[in-house]
Amino acid sequence: MSKILVTGGSGFIGTNLVDDLCSKNHEVLNFDTKEPRNKAYTKNWVKGDILNKEELLACFTSFNPDYVIHLAARTDLDETKSIAGYAANIQGVQNVVDIINTFPNIKRTIYASSRMVCRIDYVPISFDDYCPPNLYGESKVIGEKIVNEKANHEFVIVRPTSIWGPYFQIPYRTFFDTVRTNLFFIPKNHNPKKSFGFVNNTVFQIEKILFAPKENLEQNYYLTDYPALDLKEWTDMVSMEFNGKKSAEIPMLPLKIASKTGDLLQKLGWKNPPLTTFRLNNLITNMVYDTQSLEKLCGKLPYSLKEGVVITTHWMKNN
């Protein structure tokens, strides 16, 4: 078994990852500013901030990990004025890279970036072709460049797409909550394909990447389920689990009006209205990534779309 340091292990993906790694008897340490969402793993938590290099170095020195999974980041889209608000995604990454460069015993590091290094309707020609839609995406671009240019250790950069499942929060928790209350409507004549990922499959993929022989690895991966899901089919599955009926479809015009209203409410101070023009555009736009290299490495995923929906809705009903 291995010693694995997870930065940001109290977050959504990190919570599920720490749980799975511990269940396999790895020695896991979660370095995070926040307490674990799953209180069973409070004993695995060290409070610390990746922006505090001394704290971070002390953690590495005392734990002396074999592997590192760097998930810690600011992930909201609220900052619109200055990229300095996303210092964790820039200076924080620099701190992690600098420290791991001094630990030659660390076998491999996974750095989590984001699909938002490119806007949803942009198809990059390579992994270093960027088109970020906002400051968050821009901060993740800078973070990737720091890793690629400064890391002198073995690493893989992963870009989680739209991940959902137990312990999730905004925005996909909002999607499930909206479907649950019969307030989610699919636009008529819009049924896009989406490269989304159930979090337990994402954890499976991360672990495959972490422990795979070096010769089997690519330098970058999008983390997503495959094949891409059908949005209507997925929404219907969620609605059936909560409400015993399929989701409704309505014309596009009311949704456009609702999204404009959401934009206005957001400007007036409502942090998270159910629908905005940004979310509506994301909803109706195809988002499909090339998963050939990921499929070759990971093979069949452990959870089907239906199984993921059942697990997630059951968790929501009980939490």
Indicate residue ranges for each PLM-predicted region:
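N-terminal Rossmann NAD(P)H-binding glycine-rich loop of SDR-like oxidoreductase domains
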Residues: 4-24
